[in-house]
Amino acid sequence: PLMCHTPFLLPSYKSLWHSPNPPTFPPTFIHMAINRYSRLITYHGPMGVDFKPERKADIDALFNTLEGKLQVIEPLPEPPRGAIGTELGEGILRGGNMTILSMLSGTPYFLEDASWEDTLLFIEDVGEAPYKLDRMLQQFRLSGLLSRIKGLVIGTFTDCEGDDDERDYDLGYEALRYMEENRDPELLDPFVCYVTTGHGTPHQTLPLGAMINFRYISNTIIVHPYTK
């Protein structure tokens, strides 16, 4: 099975989309390779174990997304940060598990530099203490990624509270600060929004590699019908 910690599969990534039935729900390692080297859209969403009657809303949203229907994700769990206005924040959604993204940084399977400026970076994680999350954020900062992406879509960070002295750590606040740092004045102001996707419930399905819109005022994410 494809699990989160399977980097040994990456050298064979090309066989995944030359297959007559390429996987569309791979872990972050494979999400990134497929999204970088092909035009396939992959999906970050519920797994088979989540197909339960009490998860009907998640499953309905999953199949609507798979069918390419217009999706409006609302309400989002927290108010947005950053560039708040009447315009849409628009970009290509890329990313996945934050720990794995940091592992891939600097490799041929990470985001191509030329794609950074049209990217809305999605991150989520589970079981990582705040000091580890900040270390990963610093890696993205020092690489120049945060100062160039359009925005950050923060998913669910399950069991990431840390010790009592770490509970005040605010990932969204710190990320926005770094996104504004050394930013090219020709780029639009960055923003941070939040979505319930990651580990736990509810779990929205996100199409990685697709164009999405974020509406600042209504605090909603819009996934438009797409073909690739």
Model region roles, listed by residue range:
Residues 1, 121-125, 150-155:
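Short, glycine-/small-residue-enriched flexible loop/hinge segments at domain edges that mediate gating
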Residues 10-34, 41-46:
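Short, acidic/small-residue loops that bind anionic groups at enzyme active sites
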Residues 40-102:
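Conserved anion/nucleotide-ligand pocket segment
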Residues 94-134:
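Oxyanion-binding "anion nests"
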Residues 132-228:
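C-terminal active-site/capping subdomain that shapes the small-molecule cofactor and substrate pocket
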